[in-house]
Regions:
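Ser/Thr-glycine-rich phosphate-binding loops at phosphate-binding pockets of nucleotides
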Residues: 170, 174-175
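Cys-dependent protein tyrosine phosphatase-like superfamily
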Residues: 7-165, 177-256
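Short, Lys/Arg-rich N-terminal segment immediately upstream of the first membrane anchor
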Residues: 1-6
Length: 256
């Protein structure tokens, strides 16, 4: 009897394992076929079960603030586990930005729609972006120029009416810093950058499940460090040379 049970269990295991392999092969083929197949594309099998750390940025901040301040369905953030899977896992964006692009690996994160793949945009960068939440790192020209290229292009896409999504690996620090800058800038332009708004920015950051306690306060401190010496708008004007007109136009997209 025991032998029969063991044989039956082994059969079930082999069957399920075979089905899993077939499914993984299907996902890989579906992901890689089509346009841009000459690129090195990142497929994250963990996307089958892993938390995407996905959220609409404005909706998340509104929830944290306790009041609907920002227009939603403009921009979202996540981890990189979605790569190789349906764009539906990250809200079906029009444009995708990959903050974690590595010029050494040249691996492109992407999602697929029914008829095409949406490839994460990156720029002619020489480094992998890291530690953006530490303001002293913005003195590094390569970090500054690359980060500003992302911010400038994100603003352009939002102004054009496109739904934007950006991600890093965990969707935590790099994504958190870009989120903090965007919300900090927009709220400052509307005289809403108060203690409650800074708390909301930090609250959005802490929604990431992989965040460890020692990182608590990083987004709050980042915004406060900028505000010690200048406005966030002046910080972006100085570091990124983004025009005041573009800042005004993107502000109107978030708050009518």
């Amino acid at each position: 009897m025991l032998t029969k049970v063991m044989k039956y269990s082994l059969f079930i295991f082999i069957l399920l394992f075979s089905l899993l392999l077939i499914f993984m092969f299907y996902v890989k083929m579906k992901s890689l076929l089509g346009d841009n197949s000459d690129l090195s594309l990142a497929i994250r099998w963990e996307g089958f079960y892993h938390d995407m750390n996905y959220r609409d940025l404005s909706k998340s901040i509104n929830e944290c603030y306790g009041e609907k301040i920002f227009n939603e369905n403009l921009i979202s953030r996540s981890a990189g586990w979605f790569s190789g899977w349906s764009c539906g896992k990250i809200g079906n964006p029009d444009v995708l930005f990959s903050l974690n692009f590595s010029p050494k690996e040249e691996e492109h994160f992407f999602c697929h729609n029914p008829n095409e793949k949406l490839i994460g945009r990156s720029f002619e960068q020489k480094i992998v972006l890291n530690d953006l939440e530490f303001i002293e790192n913005w003195n590094n020209s390569e970090i500054r120029e690359t980060t500003c290229a992302y911010i400038d292009n994100i603003f352009s896409e939002i102004i054009s009416g496109n739904k934007v999504h950006f991600h890093c690996d965990a969707g935590r620090d790099r994504a958190g810093t870009i989120s903090a800058l965007i919300i900090g800038l927009i709220s400052e332009k509307k005289n809403l950058l108060n203690g409650n708004m800074i708390n909301a920015i930090e609250c959005d950051y802490r929604k990431t499940e992989s965040l460890t306690i020692e990182k608590y306060g990083r987004m709050e401190n980042f915004i406060k460090e900028i505000s010690k010496n200048q406005s966030i708008e002046n910080f972006i004007l100085e570091k990124c040379s983004i025009s005041g007109d573009k800042i005004e136009r993107v502000t109107k997209k978030f708050i009518n």
